[in-house]
A protein has these predicted regions:
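Short helices/loops that flank or line small-molecule/ion binding pockets
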Residues: 67, 72-84, 100, 125-126, ...
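Bacterial N-terminal signal peptides
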Residues: 7-20
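Ligand-binding clefts/hinges and TM-proximal coupling segments of bilobed small-molecule sensing domains
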Residues: 63, 139-156, 192-195, 225-244
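Periplasmic-binding protein-like
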Residues: 31-32, 106-114, 185-226, 243-244
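Flexible hinge/capping segments at coil-to-helix
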Residues: 114-132
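Extracytoplasmic small-molecule ligand-binding "clamshell" domains
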Residues: 23-93, 97, 155, 220, ...
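Short amphipathic alpha-helical coupling segments at ligand-binding clamshell hinges
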Residues: 48, 52, 123-126, 177, ...
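A ligand-binding cleft/hinge motif common to bilobed small-molecule-binding domains
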Residues: 89-98, 143-146, 172-201
């Protein structure tokens, strides 16, 4: 009787979906202020990338505990074990040397912000000889240094300083993440900044782990990401955030 009972119990668990009660928990660090992708509000992580990652994790049988920190501390959270992974990080050749990435969660990129009512520059070449500011924490500084050496690049601390230097006239333009820059310009500097409509650099954002570690986690999340793209969940999330 006992073997029969155990066999039945095993078969029940085999057909049960991986709900949060049975799911493996992973800790994911993110920039505490990176709207609309990820930010910490009232002790809760939210954003477009957060919703997408949560949906993919559910498909993969994973539960995520978020660890919001200042961007400059993200690498440290992986090194000291506070987090298993970090997101949303832009995939570029430099980061591929130290991180392994999932499939992209969302596509973003760099854009140029100028003082209103000036029109948006038509790319970096239009800013030859002019001062462009960008935060040190992102991938845009390296790209500008390599591809537009004729630009007077000033690397600063963060988005707040970038906007301050732009609006004070210290800089002619600010090179910022397209969505993040637009969100902050709209909420903090309404009417003072021309909102760009195009990217000068396209970048995919993904979840990252330290190189050579947690390949199983990457594989599981890749399957989850593929699943939510196939069943329309990804598009529904993107549409919801686009309407905000």
């Amino acid at each position: 009787m006992r073997p029969f009972f155990l066999a039945c119990l095993a078969s029940v668990f085999a057909i049960l979906p991986l709900t949060p009660a049975f799911a493996e928990t992973i800790r994911v660090a993110h920039d505490q202020r990176f709207p609309p992708f990820a930010e910490s509000k009232d002790g809760k992580s939210e954003g477009l990338a957060v919703d997408i990652l949560n949906a993919a994790a559910q498909k993969a049988g994973l539960t995520i505990v978020y660890v919001p920190v200042p961007f400059e501390q993200i690498q440290r959270t992986l090194d000291d074990g506070r987090a298993d992974a970090a997101f949303p990080l832009a995939i570029n050749p430099e980061r591929r040397q130290t991180f392994d990435f999932t499939a992209p969660l969302v596509i973003t990129g760099g854009a140029l912000f100028v003082r209103a009512p000036q029109p948006s520059p038509d790319g970096l070449k239009a800013l030859t000889g002019k001062t462009v500011v960008t935060p040190k924490t992102g991938p845009l500084a390296g790209f500008i240094q390599k591809t537009a050496p004729e630009v007077k690049l000033v690397v600063n601390a963060d988005y707040d300083q970038s906007f301050a230097q732009l609006l004070s006239g210290e800089a002619d333009a600010a090179a910022l993440n397209f969505q993040v820059g637009r969100r902050l310009a709209t909420t903090l500097h309404a009417g003072k900044v021309t909102l760009p409509e195009k990217l000068f650099l396209e970048l995919p954002l993904a979840l990252a782990v330290r190189k050579g570690e947690k390949s199983d986690l990457i594989a599981r999340l890749d399957k989850g990401i593929a699943a939510i793209r196939a069943d329309g969940t990804w598009q529904a999330i993107d549409n919801r955030w686009a309407g905000r």
